[in-house]
């Protein structure tokens, strides 16, 4: 869990904002939402496969745009 040391004469709002930012970077909220309900192993595999397909298509689109710019 992210920890934030409050500096001397630092307003509470600033420390809270730093804490929220560190939680966001660590992915705490997304992890909590993901673990909120049980997900079947088949659903996990299906989600990961869909993410892999999405990454692959995104990579292909990037390469296609790069190729089109050259000519």
Curated annotation (Swiss-Prot):
One of its GO terms (cellular component) is ribonucleoprotein complex. It comes from the Bacteria. This is Small ribosomal subunit protein bS21. HAMAP family: Ribosomal_bS21 (MF_00358). One of its GO terms (biological process) is translation. InterPro entries: Ribosomal_bS21, Ribosomal_bS21_CS, Ribosomal_bS21_sf. The keyword Ribonucleoprotein applies. It comes from Marinobacter nauticus (strain ATCC 700491 / DSM 11845 / VT8) (Marinobacter aquaeolei). Disulfide bonds: none annotated. Keywords: Ribonucleoprotein, Ribosomal protein. Belongs to the bacterial ribosomal protein bS21 family. Pfam families: Ribosomal_S21 (PF01165). One of its GO terms (molecular function) is structural constituent of ribosome.
């Amino acid at each position: 869990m992210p920890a934030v040391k409050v500096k001397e004469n630092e307003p509470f709002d600033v420390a809270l904002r730093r804490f929220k930012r560190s939680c966001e970077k660590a992915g705490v909220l997304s992890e909590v939402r993901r673990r909120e309900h049980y997900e079947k192993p088949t659903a996990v595999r299906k989600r990961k496969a869909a993410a892999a397909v999405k990454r692959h298509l995104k990579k292909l689109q990037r390469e296609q745009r790069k190729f089109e710019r050259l000519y």
